[in-house]
Amino acid sequence: MLTATKSIPEHYLQMTQEELKNHIQSIKDTLGDRLFMPTHHYQKDEVVQFADITGDSLELARICKANTQAEYFVFNGVHFMAETADILTDDHQDIYLPDLSAGCSMADMANIQQALHSYDVLTQHYHLDILPLTYVNSTAAIKKFVGEHGGSCVTSGNAKSVVKWALQQGKTILFLPDQHLGRNTAYDLGVPLEHMAVWDPIKKQLDYDGRHDQLRIVLWKGHCSVHEKFHKAHIEICLLYTSDAADDSLRV
């Protein structure tokens, strides 16, 4: 992925919305299939209007991989999404992220230096045989770290099967960076909460009072800042207002 950054030229800042729209469309028309603009479905309408395809982050990365014609990918999303697309596309294809400061709060909660330190402490101080897993919403450096230590990437859709596989390896899982996905998935697979611990990358310590030989999964203290705002009461209110709906529509 190209990481050079430049300030926006003044003449673009002086353009009206209509002028910008026409200019972008002119470039798209000129480059044709050489340019591909995957766009995350959380983007604003003013960006989505130029999208060649919209979808979630993993879907867009797979679509980029399948596109062998495009030379330039302008990925309208956040940093880890563009990195994932860059991993999957060919070397001669360039990935551009319009705003290099566009980040995911959860992905930013686990950097490679923190991951390496946690691995050293867990293996050398606590003498744990660690198998790392990372949610796909993580940096390329974290994905590389996980792969180098025999682990795997996890999606929301395959989390249960991947965590089940990891548990069968007889090692202690280090799950980054979404502690809630790791905890809920492991719990659904029968791992008791008392056999789970939380690693705090800021305090650089393990939050666990049990026996280390019973520890099945270490959860990275990370989370989605948006999901943290949802509470049980929100669901109860939604169910209250949809109480007249058909039973099938209420099954979550």
Question: Language-model features: where?
Answer:
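Metallocofactor- and cofactor-centric catalytic cores in central/energy metabolism, strongly enriched
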Residues: L2-D90, D94-T134, I142-S156, G190-L193, ...
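Conserved small/polar residues in nucleotide/adenosyl-binding loops
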Residues: Y241-D248
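Well-ordered alpha-helical segments embedded in enzymatic catalytic cores
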Residues: H23, E59-L60, V162, H234-I237
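Loop-centered beta-sheet repeat module
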Residues: V162-D209
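Short, surface-exposed amphipathic charged segments that create phosphate/polyanion-binding patches used
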Residues: M109-H117, W165-I173, H231-I237
